[in-house]
């Protein structure tokens, strides 16, 4: 097996090898692939180094399967997982006493407040030393992973020696726990690259990985010279006159997955040649210069509407079957791609907010009921803040962030009140309505009265427990699963806090963000372009694309399709899917207009003025609303809409 394992320095990955679904001998139960930055040929062998022979019946197909297994270190991993959980619990308990920024001149007496702390740290330190010795004996060398464990017990020993200094070491404890957890995640993945698998008869030797010097040098020189002329943004190169030029506004991994699907499914079935290019940004400029594509995939934000306002894209309502395609999506998913009665983008991705919460921490501080409404969230704050904790909301980081960003608190409050940003004919805002002013005041109160932070790292705060409640995009789940294994099972998610309606029911309405596919009006064959985006947005292809991306990138790269039937077929558990669909059914959308930029700027200006300068929220939003409506009117006249 020509392979390379260059992720876990000082250790090895393990594989169990099956021949026709059977492990043929004990040596195949665990084949080790040691750390090396170079490629090596690994051949399963016995204790004396003799090759393993397998009988294969001639004339038949045979299957080789490689299964990732933990190997001998599995017991150490289980012990480490328990230790990480214990240290995290003590970290939170200490944090409740000292707060996130301990005063170095204050003696917090944490060892008295937590009497068992020093004894337990001593036991944990001993166990970490034992685990480190075990790992080094298995690997045969001192790797970075064992060094990380060593750093952890050195810190614990300092805490044991001088308990009064424990608050000083809080950050180091947190950082080392994160480092150990990260390595545990990598080990669980059992990283391994495989170039090829070679089967040889007993009278032959396996191919060496060493290449002849001249051949290697020639290849390197050729690759170097080619790098000056190669267009790395081009994924495929078709030269037919009727080729469909498609730009992809994503990374190379995603583009290669689309290329695989196009070559294996679309082109053979429809006989339409396709050129794929990676282009991140510059689409509007290229289209205005007449150098744009025929089709662009994964355009998001205000781009589809801005392109439509400039007359650069095709109205998708003209194509046969558009209603059937849209029926696969949430009923309002297309709203953000509509302009002046037309549809200028086909939804591909759709993400929306949910509320994540730490079950362990909320239970520990006596919050047994998960907040269902905004009032419930506010009622939870005293218990959180008494313990130096808080909750996190979605707030754009600058005035140029989309005002309709998924989970934007003002947008949630407006939608849950039965309002939208704009009136029916999109000629002015609704911010002058009493309920809209109430929504704005509620939003600013979170930051002025209840002292929510305007900027924070949601992942770090949720991971270390200082923010046991955060509202984030549902794809935040992927990051927690992949990058915070030490808190697996300690958290969950549910719908965003809601607003009680007049009839007593609760509205959990929220907006979403997404990306779509657009067809440019320079396209030679509109029907071919429509066939392509209809094919790509179909349930079968969206499932295939989602599986390819998750296979390449892992859980962190799990796809968020707008096609709900495709979403249901991805790797979500039934309970997780029920929660996602629960929020999905509550989604409402805020339209995009060419003057959305002025809405964005003035909403955030009003917020900063009311919160940071302590101005009256009502007066602030009413005053700036006049500027918003004046710019909307000017823009509509400029575009000939009025």
Where do the language-model regions lie?
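Beta-strand-rich ligand-recognition modules
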Residues: 4-81
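Conserved C-terminal helix/tail region of periplasmic/extracytoplasmic solute-binding proteins
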Residues: 78-238, 581-642
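Hinge/lid segment of periplasmic solute-binding proteins
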Residues: 217-240, 301-354, 378-380, 406, ...
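Extracytoplasmic "Venus flytrap"/periplasmic binding protein-like
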Residues: 264-332, 336, 360-365, 369-372, ...
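Extracytoplasmic/periplasmic solute-binding protein
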Residues: 339-348, 353, 375-429, 435-436, ...
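Glycine-centered hinge/linker elements that transmit conformational signals in sensory
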Residues: 382, 425-455, 496
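Extracytoplasmic/periplasmic substrate-recognition and gating elements
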Residues: 484-555, 588, 605
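Long, aromatic- and glycine/proline-rich binding clefts that accommodate carbohydrate-like moieties
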Residues: 494-498, 547-605, 609, 640-642
């Amino acid at each position: 097996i020509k392979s390379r394992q260059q992720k876990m320095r000082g250790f090895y990955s393990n594989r169990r090898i099956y021949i026709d679904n059977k492990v043929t001998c004990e040596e195949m139960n665990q084949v080790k692939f040691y750390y090396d930055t170079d490629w090596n040929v690994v051949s399963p062998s016995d204790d004396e180094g003799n090759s393993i022979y397998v009988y294969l019946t001639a004339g038949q197909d045979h299957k080789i399967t490689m299964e990732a297994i933990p190997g001998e270190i599995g017991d150490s991993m289980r012990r480490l997982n328990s230790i990480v959980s214990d240290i995290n619990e003590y970290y939170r308990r200490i944090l409740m006493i000292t707060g996130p920024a301990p005063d170095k001149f204050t003696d917090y007496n944490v060892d008295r407040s937590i009497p068992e702390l020093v004894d337990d740290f001593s036991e944990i330190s001993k166990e970490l030393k034992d685990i480190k010795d075990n790992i080094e004996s298995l690997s045969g060398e001192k790797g970075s992973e064992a060094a990380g464990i060593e750093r952890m017990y050195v810190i614990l020993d300092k805490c044991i020696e001088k308990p009064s200094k424990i608050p000083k070491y809080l950050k180091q404890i947190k950082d080392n726990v994160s480092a150990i957890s990260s390595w545990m995640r990598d080990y669980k993945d059992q990283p391994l690259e495989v170039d090829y698998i070679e089967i040889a008869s007993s009278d032959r030797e396996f191919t060496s990985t060493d290449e002849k010097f001249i051949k290697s040098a020639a290849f390197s020189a050729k690759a170097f010279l080619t790098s000056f002329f190669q267009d790395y943004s081009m994924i495929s190169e078709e030269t037919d006159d009727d080729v469909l030029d498609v730009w992809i506004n994503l990374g190379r991994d995603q583009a290669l997955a689309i290329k695989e699907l196009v070559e294996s499914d679309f082109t053979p079935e429809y006989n339409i040649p396709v050129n794929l290019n990676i282009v991140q940004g510059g689409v509007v400029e290229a289209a205005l210069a007449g150098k744009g594509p025929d089709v662009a995939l994964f355009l998001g934000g205000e781009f589809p509407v801005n392109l439509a306002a400039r007359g650069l894209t095709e109205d998708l309502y003209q194509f046969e079957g558009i209603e059937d395609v849209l029926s696969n999506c949430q009923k309002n998913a297309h709203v953000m791609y509509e302009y002046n009665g037309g549809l200028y983008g086909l939804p591909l991705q759709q993400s929306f907010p949910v509320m994540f919460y730490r079950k362990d921490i909320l239970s520990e501080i006596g919050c047994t009921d998960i907040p269902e409404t905004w009032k419930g969230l506010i009622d939870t704050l005293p218990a959180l803040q008494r313990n130096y904790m808080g909750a996190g909301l979605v707030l754009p980081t600058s005035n140029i962030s989309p005002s309709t960003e998924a989970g934007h608190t003002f947008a949630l409050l407006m939608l849950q009140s039965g309002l939208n940003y704009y009136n029916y004919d999109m000629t002015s805002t609704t911010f002058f309505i009493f309920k809209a002013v109430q929504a704005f005041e509620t939003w600013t109160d979170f930051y002025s009265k209840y002292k929510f932070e305007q900027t924070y790292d949601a992942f770090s705060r949720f991971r270390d427990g200082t923010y046991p409640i955060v509202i984030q995009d549902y794809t935040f789940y992927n990051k927690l699963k992949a990058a915070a294994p030490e808190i697996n099972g300690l958290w969950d998610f549910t719908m965003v806090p809601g607003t009680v309606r007049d009839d007593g029911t609760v509205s959990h309405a929220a907006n979403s963000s997404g990306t779509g596919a657009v067809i440019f009006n320079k396209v030679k064959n509109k029907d071919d372009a429509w066939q392509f985006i209809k094919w790509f947005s179909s349930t079968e292809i969206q499932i295939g694309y989602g599986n390819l991306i998750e296979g390449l990138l892992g859980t962190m790269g799990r796809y968020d399709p707008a096609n709900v039937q495709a979403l249901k077929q991805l790797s979500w558990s039934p309970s997780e899917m029920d929660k996602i669909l629960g929020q999905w059914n509550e989604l409402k959308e805020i339209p995009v207009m060419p003057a959305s930029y002025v809405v964005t700027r003035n909403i955030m200006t009003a917020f900063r003025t009311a919160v940071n300068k302590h101005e009256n929220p009502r007066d602030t939003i009413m005053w700036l609303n006049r500027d918003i409506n004046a710019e909307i009117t000017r823009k509509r006249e400029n575009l000939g809409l009025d």
